[in-house]
Curated annotation (Swiss-Prot):
Keywords: Amino-acid biosynthesis, Arginine biosynthesis, ATP-binding, Cytoplasm, Ligase, Nucleotide-binding. Pfam families: Arginosuc_syn_C, Arginosuc_synth. Pathway: Amino-acid biosynthesis; L-arginine biosynthesis; L-arginine from L-ornithine and carbamoyl phosphate: step 2/3. It comes from the Archaea. It comes from Archaeoglobus fulgidus (strain ATCC 49558 / DSM 4304 / JCM 9628 / NBRC 100126 / VC-16). One of its GO terms (molecular function) is ATP binding. Signal peptide: none annotated. L-citrulline binds at residues 83, 119, 123, 169, 178, 254, 266. It is an enzyme of class 6 (ligase). SUPFAM superfamilies: Adenine nucleotide alpha hydrolases-like (SSF52402), Argininosuccinate synthetase, C-terminal domain (SSF69864). L-aspartate binds at residues 115, 119-120. PROSITE patterns: ARGININOSUCCIN_SYN_1, ARGININOSUCCIN_SYN_2. ATP binds at residues 6-14, 113. This is Argininosuccinate synthase.
Length: 390
């Protein structure tokens, strides 16, 4: 019997390889690592471990597909309770690639290394079950702890980066880096500086601010500092620039799908800069009613992504609405980066619904006296209510 395992090269998925044979009776374990912008060293390490411990290994390049999904996220100002959805958006894509290999190999089942307390189990399994595969989840089904896994790996000669002193679970892709576990599970514990890799400490960031200019076309970032580049290169460059200035750290309490509250630590410099810039450009070109309704759509969109429900028909409908709003979201935005902050300082668009002449205090383009009639009726119902009951 064959099983295809979604494989990151980390502790959880690595111990799943022998467990799938020992506890579940599979003859062949095939590992699949999906490249969505992780560091090259991580991809190489996963390949080496997959080839060493599994019977067969695949590495699939899905960076372009992931960037396309990130463009949609930017247009949706994707954000769940302050989380920029990097891991959540990646999981269904990874699951689809695992399914492709499972079909190719004629596997009887697919597997993942997610725990029974997190969200990823749901994101993976929704896609796996959509394609009719039997799902194996050793970490959840065997009720494993990270300490048990570390000891099991040691006994089986499996080399893993996690230790009992630093039992962190780290997930990284082009959009974000997340760190959880260990002492970080105590919400009163201040995270040590060594958990961060993408971002400088804001206190130690450069004393001189830096301004970046981002060009958008129909809601999609297409140029950085007047240089056109592909999405992958642009996001990677902003991660480096923003990280240098300590931009994009999030330490938050997050409401998981199962109802548990979890402490999460994220790094996402490019995401912070791009969403800040994109939202500001929308404020310039979209009408008040478009902006108001889009906020509701964005909340629903983010929740569907967070819950792993990107195959829900509502998700397609929300995307269609968002795409319609982006037809005029073209222009440029300048963002100042300084010691952890990303602040918009200038913006311009040929579709701006802003008139300097009309809004200026120093012009007579609008006869101010015309506002008198509007002012007489503004708040009328509230005034009538107060007269009746006071």
């Amino acid at each position: 019997m064959k099983v295809v395992l979604s494989y990151s090269g980390g502790l959880d998925t690595t111990v799943c390889i022998p467990l799938l044979k020992e506890k579940y009776g599979f003859d062949e374990v095939i590992t699949v690592t999906v490249d969505i912008g992780q560091p090259e060293a991580d991809i190489k390490q996963a390949e080496e471990r997959g080839k060493k411990y599994a019977d067969k290994h695949y590495t699939i390049d899905a960076k372009k597909e992931f960037v396309d999904s990130l463009f949609m996220l930017i247009k949706a100002n994707g954000n769940y309770e302050g989380y920029v959805l990097g891991t959540a958006l990646a999981r269904p894509l990874i699951a689809e690639k695992v399914v492709e290999v499972a079909k190719k190999e004629g596997a009887e089942a697919v597997a993942h290394g997610c725990t029974g307390k997190g969200n990823d189990q749901l994101r993976f399994e929704n896609i796996f079950r959509q394609h009719g595969f039997k799902v194996i989840a050793p970490v959840r089904e065997l009720n494993l702890t990270r300490e048990w896994e570390i000891e099991y790996a040691r006994q089986h000669g499996i080399e893993v980066p996690a230790t009992k002193e630093k039992p962190y679970s780290i997930d990284e892709n082009l959009w974000s880096r997340s760190v959880e576990g260990g002492k970080l599970e105590d919400p009163s514990f201040e995270p040590p500086e060594d958990i961060y890799e993408w971002t400088a400490s804001p206190e130690k960031a450069p004393d001189k601010p830096e301004i970046v200019k981002i060009d958008f076309e129909k809601g999609v970032p297409v140029a950085l500092n007047d240089e056109r580049m592909g999405g992958f290169e642009l996001i990677k460059a902003l991660n480096e620039i923003g990280g240098k200035h300590g931009v994009g750290r999030t330490d938050m309490i997050e409401d998981r799908v199962l109802g548990l509250k979890a402490r999460e630590n994220y790094e996402h410099p490019a995401a912070t800069i791009l969403i800040t810039a994109h939202r500001d450009l929308e404020n310039l070109v979209l009408s008040r009613r478009e902006l108001k309704f889009k906020k509701f759509v964005e909340e629903e969109w983010a929740e569907l992504v967070y819950y792993g429900l990107v195959n829900d028909p509502l998700f397609d409908a929300l995307n269609a609405f968002i795409d319609k709003t982006q037809e005029r979201v073209t222009g440029w935005v300048k963002v100042k980066l300084y010691k952890g902050s990303a602040v918009v300082v200038a913006r311009n668009s040929p579709y701006a619904l802003y008139s300097e002449e009309l809004v200026s205090f120093d012009t007579e383009s609008i006869d101010q006296r015309l506002a008198e009639g509007f002012a007489a009726f503004h708040g009328l119902q509230g005034r009538l209510f107060r007269r009746l009951f006071q």
